Regions:
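Conserved RNase H-like, two-metal-ion catalytic cores of nucleic-acid enzymes
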Residues: 1-109
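Acidic, glycine-rich two-metal-ion catalytic cores of nucleic acid-processing enzymes
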Residues: 2-3, 18, 28-48, 55-58, ...
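Helical catalytic core of nucleic-acid polymerases
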Residues: 83-85, 89, 93-155, 168-178, ...
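Generic structural signal for residues in well-ordered beta-strands
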Residues: 88-91, 368, 404-406
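Surface-exposed helix-capping loop/turn segments at secondary-structure junctions
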Residues: 148-160, 360-368
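Acidic two-metal-ion nuclease catalytic site recognized across multiple nuclease folds
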Residues: 160-170
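C-terminal polymerase-core module
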Residues: 283-288, 298-343, 379, 383-423
Length: 423
């Protein structure tokens, strides 16, 4: 049913509010970030009936989007995308559900109709193309997606990881919605969790936000959206070394991790830093295992992790209990598995700290605009005061367990270290 009047809307809402459903948003322009596009249609399948709510389409009598809050489960292809358009609870991301078990991204390549392909190719410059693609063709495509989702729900519903589905996707959606201001206007990032290690990639519109070059000046265009604002970056110090230390119960003394390591190697700070990361991500020589108690414990941990992986056919993360299955990984060895585990530890610790941070900063004017592996970027409104920055720093550091360095600047290229201001 295409819902075009109040009578049809009442029937739909009565049915929708009493059942679980699949919801698929159809934006006006699929080439734009969801924050820059608007809804054209909303496809809803209650497993018994299907409905299409026309919000902005040339063929229909359009309606205002109703309140769709429900206590029932709502399944969708992409929870993060749906939350850009609708404020809903109990939304289950079927793509994530399936990925948690199979390690594979759902195949979406053959879901377009010939009308979608033809019109997108012929009118590739036209904005809001979905508003002129026939509604019946949108329904045809949505039926294919809905069938695929139902098949995956039947197979993998027991593998829903609530922490990933709710907590992590909500955190990333929060950052995405804030956007980043540039000298050319606001741009938006898009995090992708479908990576072998679980560490999100982050790119949209030709920009790889997870790998912005620090040296070529490409960061210079990122500025504050506020007249009295600056960008502030908080960067974890020796993050991976400290994460693993926590895992293996090794306590670093106060101060610099690399100066501590230099004492074992008999080298200067920079060389100690280079060697520690070389050993952490690669081969640990026998003499280092003998002289360095940290890497002795790391070596034992790697061997233990490898044995668990071989015996159980999976390893499980500490924080969110995500399983990485042997059958989904290729050409694995002990060190490669350890590297995957480090990245998963990093990601999940970051998500845990975001879950603590976001409720505390939501009401401030300043915006959290980027998270990248071991750093967090804030668009800081001076009116929020240094107390705001101190609050963020304290939450990130988790009782001083993971010290952060702080820098700020009028743009993301020219950043000045101000860590000493917070000592």
């Amino acid at each position: 049913m295409i819902v075009e009047n109040n009578k049809q809307l009442k029937k739909f809402l009565k049915d929708f509010k009493s059942k679980e459903s699949i919801i698929l948003p159809i934006e006006q322009d699929s080439n734009l970030h969801p924050q820059k596009s608007k809804l054209s249609l909303l496809y809803v399948n209650t497993f018994d009936d299907e409905y299409v709510l026309p919000i902005n389409h040339n063929e229909c009598l359009n309606i205002d989007l109703p309140n769709l809050k429900t206590k029932n489960k709502v399944y969708t292809l992409d929870r993060k995308k749906l939350l850009h358009f609708l404020d809903l609870d109990n939304v289950i991301d079927v793509s994530m559900m399936s990925y948690m078990r199979t390690g594979k991204v759902l195949e979406l390549d053959n879901l377009n109709t010939t009308a979608h392909d033809f019109l997108n190719m012929k009118f590739y410059k036209k904005k809001n193309i979905n508003t002129v693609i026939p509604v019946l063709k949108h329904i045809e495509k949505c039926r294919k997606i809905s069938t695929m989702l139902q098949n995956n729900i039947e197979k993998y519903s027991e593998y829903v990881n609530v922490s990933y589905n709710d907590e992590i996707l909500n955190n990333l959606s929060f950052i995405e919605k804030n956007g980043l201001m540039t000298t050319e206007g606001k741009v938006f990032s898009e995090y992708n969790l479908y990576t072998s290690t679980g560490r999100p990639s982050n790119r949209f519109g030709g920009i790889n936000f997870a790998a912005l070059n620090k040296k070529d000046g490409s960061r210079k265009k990122f500025i504050s959206r506020f007249k009295n604002g600056v960008l502030v970056e908080m960067d974890f110090d020796a993050y991976h070394l400290r994460l693993i230390a926590d895992k293996i119960n090794y306590e670093f003394p106060k101060g610099s991790v690399h100066e501590h390591m230099a004492q074992f190697y008999g080298v200067d700070y920079e060389e100690a830093k280079r060697l520690s990361f070389q050993y952490l991500y690669g081969y640990i020589p026998e003499d280092v295992i003998q002289i360095n108690p940290y890497f002795s414990k790391v070596h034992d941990y790697i061997e233990g992790l490898w044995n668990i992986y071989k015996n159980d056919d999976f390893v499980e993360s500490d924080i969110y209990k995500r399983r990485i299955y042997k059958e989904n990984l290729l050409d694995m060895n002990a060190n490669k598995l350890f590297n995957y585990t480090i990245q998963l530890m990093e990601t999940e610790n970051n998500m845990k700290v975001l879950s603590a941070l976001i409720p505390e900063i939501r009401e401030y004017k300043s915006k959290l605009i980027l998270y990248s592996y071991d750093s967090f970027l804030l668009d800081f409104n001076i009116e929020d005061g240094l107390d705001y920055l101190m609050k963020v720093k304290n939450i990130l550091e988790q009782d001083k367990k993971y010290p952060v360095k702080v820098s700020w600047g009028l743009n993301y290229h020219d950043m000045e270290d101000i860590t000493e201001k917070f000592v």
